[in-house]
Amino acid sequence: MQNRHHARLLPSSALLSHEAAAGVMLMAASAIGMVFANSIWQASYEYWLNIETGPLTMRGWINDALMALFFLLAGLEIKREILYGHLSHWSQRLLPGVAAIGGMVVPAIIYVAFNHSGEALRGWAIPTATDIAFALGVLALAGSRVPGILKVFLTALAIVDDLGAVIVIALFYTGTLSVLPGAGVAAILGLLLMLNRQGVRTLFPYLLAGVPLWWLTLKSGIHPTVAGVGLALLIPAGHDEASPLMRLEHMLSWPVRFVILPLFGFANAGISLHGVTVGQMLSPLTLGVGAALMLGKPLGVLGAVSILQLSGASGFPPYITWRHRIGIAFLCGIGFTMSLFIAILAFPGTAAVNQIKLGILSGSMLSGLCGYILLRGPAVADR
């Protein structure tokens, strides 16, 4: 029975190849951004990203508007997994849920150990996230050597991580609230809830309401990407592929993974290395983020899994070796997209962002490399 249950939960090869391709696209776009930021095109790169178009710059439209669609998709995936997927039963939620909490708490503690005072403390949440596109991309490179149950575990953990990141952004990175726009946000959410309760399954009214919801959220002082999650939670769900939730998820999946996330990587991963000193590379901000991702994430995930295994509450099957566990824990240290996003919120328009980005890039790359090396070992068949 347990074997059939595991088999039912294994993600399809099509899904994994889709995620892997998205991860490769994100890596490529980020690398191109780095090339532009350190070449003769640096001035043009910065100029185009900082052109004001309406109320926002080009970078602002990417980070505040397009990324709201990323959070809408993330919210839909979280809702689907909790209702019908890998997290639909408490027994399924326990292992990835506790591992995700451990993987958020320990990196935050390590970051604070390096940056325990002043403005730097605002970045405590930066190393707490896992980039599912990057992580699954690296996992796909290891091929059939990786037991399927680890792919399920990583996917479920990243979903819980996304949920934690959304809560952190809403609670800790919201500015001064404006009453009237905030009231408008509440009114639109109330209207959407009413539509949901009345059984309205046409997507159009939900998407139409999403536009003023985003605008009022932006004006209220709450980060506008939170509007995407709020909208996702009120989209009607269902078991079948024809449900509004599933239809919208399919509509958003390709443009978010292959257009929006690469654009985000291109616009935000570009760090100018001209004039970077050893002191900056070894600054508490850079070291704090890098160490938190590369050491804190795997320690937190492994520690949480070990506690559950020893207590008998949950755990991996016996054929999952320590090499597999450590390898998958290292992949959780690939923070990238969400870490960059939180860094921008924590240190808007400051010189500290470049030091943070160095830590994110170095910590994520080293975590991915360590995870890949460990998972490239001899294949283990699923049982």
Swiss-Prot record:
- Keyword Chloroplast belongs to the record: no
List the GO cellular component terms: plasma membrane
Tell me one Pfam family matched here: Na_H_antiport_1
Q: What is the membrane topology here?
A: Multi-pass membrane protein
Where, per UniProt, does this protein localize?
Cell inner membrane
Catalytic activity field: Na(+)(in) + 2 H(+)(out) = Na(+)(out) + 2 H(+)(in)
What name appears for this protein in its UniProt entry? Na(+)/H(+) antiporter NhaA
* Family from the record: Belongs to the NhaA Na(+)/H(+) (TC 2.A.33) antiporter family.
Which residues belong to the signal peptide in this entry? none
Q: Which domain of life is it from?
A: Bacteria
Q: What does this protein do?
A: Na(+)/H(+) antiporter that extrudes sodium in exchange for external protons.
Instruction: List membrane-spanning regions.
Output: 21-41, 56-76, 94-114, 123-143, 152-172, 175-195, 202-222, 258-278, 287-307, 326-346, 355-375
Matches recorded under InterPro entries: Na/H_antiporter_dom_sf, NhaA
